[in-house]
């Protein structure tokens, strides 16, 4: 967490104290927020995604394919069950207990994702194998990736989806 996040939380806490009569004013008013330079999120090149998918064991392919071609967050993929993946109907159901936002959403399965998932699909059970971080690190080393950007697969999906479909509103509903 950064300075601004802490400041925001403290501001709310002190406002609560003011409403209860414990304080006359909020002391966080005099603290300046830190100006954070906006940076573009790092993404993977298409060749890197292909190399990654070919470098991981078969059992881990669905995790990386869903991150790359459906844009789910790592924790969302880790919580997915195969019963959430509807290949025939063409969507992944991200249930509230799976989603970061605790809301239900349906994410389209694009043809490239379907092609990766179809030969590996199961009727039920966890999508993500145990020790996914170790699997990722081994594959990353194998293909020579020195950095693993936070949410890199998700950001890659967003960038490529927007470039292909040119519809920010559609992308927002998928994310």
Provide a role label for each language-model segment.
Residues 1-15, 20-22, 38, 126-131, ...:
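N-terminal core-binding DNA-recognition domain of tyrosine site-specific recombinases/integrases
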Residues 4-6, 19, 23-74, 78, ...:
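Basic, Lys/Arg- and aromatic-enriched nucleic-acid-binding interface segment
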Residues 35, 43, 94-102, 114, ...:
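Catalytic-site neighborhood detector that most strongly recognizes the C-terminal catalytic loop/helix
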Residues 54, 61, 70, 107, ...:
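Short, basic (Lys/Arg/His-rich) helix/loop patches that form interaction surfaces
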Residues 79-85, 172-175:
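A short, basic/aromatic helix-end/turn motif that makes direct DNA contacts
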Residues 91, 104-106:
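Well-ordered beta-strand positions in beta-sheet-rich domains
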């Amino acid at each position: 967490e950064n300075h601004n996040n802490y400041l925001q939380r403290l501001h709310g806490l002190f406002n609560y104290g003011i409403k209860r009569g414990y304080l006359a004013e909020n002391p966080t008013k005099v603290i300046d927020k830190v100006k954070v330079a906006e940076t573009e999120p790092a993404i993977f090149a298409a060749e890197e995604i292909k190399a990654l998918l070919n470098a991981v064991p078969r059992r881990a392919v669905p995790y990386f394919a869903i991150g790359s071609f459906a844009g789910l967050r790592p924790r969302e993929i880790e919580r997915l069950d195969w019963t959430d993946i509807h290949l025939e109907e063409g969507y992944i159901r991200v249930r509230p207990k799976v989603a970061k936002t605790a809301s239900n959403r349906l994410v389209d399965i694009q043809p490239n994702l379907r092609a990766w998932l179809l030969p590996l699909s199961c009727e039920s059970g966890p999508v993500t194998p145990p020790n996914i971080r170790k699997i990722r690190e081994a594959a990353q080393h194998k293909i020579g990736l020195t950095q693993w950007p936070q949410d890199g697969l998700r950001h890659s999906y967003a960038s490529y989806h927007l470039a292909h479909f040119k519809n920010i509103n559609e992308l927002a509903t998928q994310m």
